Amino acid sequence: AAENVAIAARQSEPLLDMKQRTTHEDPNFMETFFRASRLHYIGTWKHRYEAFLEDLPPAPKLPAPRGGPGGERVILHVDMDCFFASVAALGRPELAGLPVAVSWSSAGGGELSSCNYLARATGCRAGMRIARAKEMCPNLIVMPYEFERYSAVAIDVYRLLHELSPHVMGVSVDEAYVDVTGLDGDPVQIAEDIRERIATKTGCAASVGVGPNRLIARLATKKAKPDAAYHVTATSAA
């Protein structure tokens, strides 16, 4: 049943037709090749995110650090866990509890773009060839790219982040920084609250690192993963 889900998803996306992707006899070869590529998606996502921002009011001035001059800022680094693979499983109960990866191809020479944690536990990693991944994980389900689904979930996530704070810096479709210095409350609880909102709204998990600046917040995310929050203060980072 899970394999049938992957086949149906691939067949529903004409850009992933193997003939279009591999033969120069198709006059639209170059167009379809780039439209089906991850790099093309990254570019189009940037334009979509910029359009999303245009509908928002200008962000006010950043609040002062907590505790006044010399105090710390509170920065969240929000990083969606195994984003492409997580979105692939949404609304597909057949994939629950199974190792899932994403690749433009289902053939052995294709390269994995994203793997869920069940797949990673077997040794599968992004950048690995499908043939090698299947040797390590014979029941691996390889889903196709589904760019519209990624964008829809990402916009939902960014809406939640902008509801939390107007000071959001988008990094990519699955990663952002949020300055929540002006919010009252424990920083870890703020992080846990936004994680819960994201999970409830999208069905996807996010890990959140908390720190006094973007660098430390990002390092904290490494401790938070998978699916948790972690706070590193300037003192503890020293």
PLM feature spans:
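Residues that scaffold, gate, or flank divalent-cation-dependent active/transport sites
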Residues: 2-173, 177, 183, 194, ...
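Long, highly charged, low-complexity intrinsically disordered interaction regions
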Residues: 186-238
